[in-house]
A protein has these predicted regions:
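Active-site glycine-rich loop that binds ribose-phosphate moieties when present
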Residues: 136-159, 184-186
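Short glycine-rich anion-binding loops that position phosphate/pyrophosphate groups of nucleotides
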Residues: 15, 137, 167
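Short, solvent-exposed secondary-structure boundary/capping segments
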Residues: 128-135
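A glycine-rich beta-to-alpha transition motif near the start of alpha/beta enzyme domains, typified by
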Residues: 1-126, 170-290
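Non-cytosolic beta-sheet module surface loops
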Residues: 136, 163, 218-220
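Internal active-site segments that recognize and position negatively charged phosphoryl groups
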Residues: 150-180
Length: 290
């Protein structure tokens, strides 16, 4: 039998967008794309939408220069092993873990991500809500109109292209089409022109529910359909606000896994609010050859 390597892990989720957290404070873990795929496999591994490696900035060569600004770097990987700039739900789970383990000295902190420094706040006596500063949405108009078609459907839908900071194509459904009628979104939607997103794109399908209230489903690049997407919720809320000026400062976004809230700051920046749960901890074993 092949020798195995024991690796501690924690399982958590933000509105059912679930993650495997790997505490690696000293930055010693060799987290290959193959290992990420194995961890996220819901039959062979633990199962998750992505992996969050928890490492101190001082021990990560890429972020050591930021150690005086942020103590921890959120190394986020998609389920297919690819790197991602940011994950709003993952950031909430990441901060929830730091708070639960006593790694935070206060309820406000800054974490490092590939998208830059991100402010976070823990709210509630039982940390019922985590707030993540998502920054400003970048409108990214393309030289050609963006359209989306779901495999198996004939309808071609217009999309709005934005970055939060990872790329999103946001589709608002016409009144004649309901979110529940779209069927599974595990297969990547057909986005045209394909060269618009050379590294892939997250696609949100959105419906208006009421004033400052929308519901959404999402196909995440490198993952498939997920129960929630934090950056996607921000992208959808931002596009909704451009379509009809908001009367308030907060959008409610319903996703299959629950509800999150997107707050609009006066300077154009967005905050993502919602729950984060830690549900299990243990040790995972994989063959050294993996």
């Amino acid at each position: 039998m092949a020798r195995v390597l024991d690796v501690p892990f924690v399982k958590g989720h933000g509105t059912e967008n679930d993650f495997v957290l790997l505490p690696d404070f000293e930055g010693r873990l060799d987290l290959t794309a193959e290992r990420v795929r194995w961890l996220c496999d819901r039959r062979k591994g633990i199962g998750a939408d992505g992996v969050l490696r928890v490492v101190r900035c001082a021990h990560d060569p890429e972020f050591a220069d930021y150690a005086d600004v942020a103590e921890f770097f959120m190394d986020y990987r998609n389920a297919d092993g690819s790197l991602a700039e940011m994950c709003g739900n993952g950031a909430r789970v990441f901060v929830r873990y730091l708070h639960a383990t006593g790694a935070l000295s206060s309820r406000t902190t800054v974490i490092a991500t590939r998208a830059g420094m991100v402010a976070a706040e823990v709210r509630g006596t039982e940390a019922e809500e985590i707030v993540i500063g998502m920054g400003a949405v970048v409108d990214s108009p393309q030289p050609l109109p963006i359209t989306v078609r779901i495999p198996g459907h004939e309808t071609v839908m217009d999309a709005t292209s934005v970055h939060v900071p990872n790329p999103h194509a946001v589709v608002f459904l016409e009144d004649t089409l309901d979110l529940d009628e779209l069927g599974p979104l595990d297969t990547p939607p057909v986005v045209t022109p394909p060269q618009a997103y050379p590294e892939g794109v997250n696609v949100e399908f959105v419906q208006h529910v009421g004033p400052e209230h929308i519901r959404m489903r999402v196909h995440e690049r490198g993952v498939g359909e997920t129960r929630s997407c934090g950056t996607g919720a921000c992208a959808a809320a931002w596009v909704a606000a451009t379509m009809s000026p908001a009367t308030g400062d907060t959008y409610r976004v319903d996703v299959p896994g629950g509800t999150v809230f997107v707050d609009f700051e006066s300077d154009g920046r967005l905050n993502l609010r919602g729950p984060a749960e830690l549900v299990a901890r243990g040790t995972v074993q994989w063959p050294r050859g993996l």
